[in-house]
Amino acid sequence: MIFGTVPLAEAEGAILAHSLRASTGKIPKGSYLTAADLTALAQAGFEAVTVARLEANDQHEDAAALALAQALVSDEAGQNIRISGAGAGRVNLYARSCGIVRLDPHALNAVNAADPMITIATVPDYHRVDRDGMLATIKIISYGVPETALWQAGAGASGSIWVQPPVYKSATLIETKVTDETPPDKGRRAMGGRLQRMGLDLSPRVIVPHREADLADALTKAPGEVLLILTGSATSDPADVAPSALRQAGGTVTRFGMPVDPGNLLFLGDFGEKPVIGLPGCARSPALNGADWVLERVLCAEPVTGADISAMGVGGLLKEIPTRPMPRAKA
């Protein structure tokens, strides 16, 4: 691409680099200059303009952005992604359903390394997205790029971004109580909102005494495909009431504790084919906490190993909820 300032007499057919006010009105940047445009610019007192001209092997910014998007998303249905139209060198990628965004960072870094004028910016890996939520934007910075650079950027990029949708339809939240009083429904409302935005229904309310036998019985009778436990007393050890109840019911505990705050006291396990999440007390708040990161992956059938949870510590210091009984600074 050739870029620079030229006399008006040499500018016809070139791409205007900066918006200008002519005698007939504003000529937007990116416009292909016509003879009429040049006459209007001359009438406005311009003698020269800054323009770009594409060379034989260049791709226009819009065509380049769309071509790269199609290279990245070669299967819109399979990758669960919708490609937008192109404009001003930009194409956006949108989720076709709710879910979590999965990325191949190595492949995407290679896209951005091909040429400084060719860029893609994405949300983080495992980011929760709603239907029609934007998950990436492709921007060609210059008015055109060489076809060779565009080919290099797209090579190996196919399938490097996709949206994993939820696979479950229902969940049961089992709450325990430490007194005869019914717990406030704050936690149920917060969890119901989390499940609803991922397309899951919450089964009727279940409240049992904070005892292993009662909780184990509730787990065996729970109708949901995903089982959630919110205890009236914090779970502070792998041998505490809730993890022990899961084992007593015939389930397994695969992980207790996570390096995300708020969210440290989460535990993860399974009961037959059903995933089980022991929720930390912060799940009663709709604010982001460690349980969200685990819940969203579980609902989308993404494996969550102990190593995965251990890796959440970097970036795991989240905003403290206002109602926290013991704020960090006072501990």
Q: Model segments located where?
A:
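Short, low-complexity N-terminal leaders and the immediately following helix N-cap/first helix
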Residues: 1-88
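Solvent-exposed alpha-helices and their adjacent loops that cap or buttress functional pockets
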Residues: 9, 13, 42, 83-86, ...
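Residue-level "contact hotspot" at macromolecular interaction interfaces
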Residues: 26, 32, 125-128, 259
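Generic structural signal for buried aliphatic residues
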Residues: 32-33, 49, 129-136, 141, ...
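Generic secondary-structure signature for well-ordered alpha-helical cores
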Residues: 43-47, 70-77, 131-134, 140, ...
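Extended, charged alpha/beta regions that create polyanion-binding interfaces
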Residues: 55-166
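Phosphate-binding glycine-rich loops and their immediate beta-loop-alpha structural context
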Residues: 131, 141-228
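Short glycine/threonine-rich loop/turn motifs
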Residues: 203-331
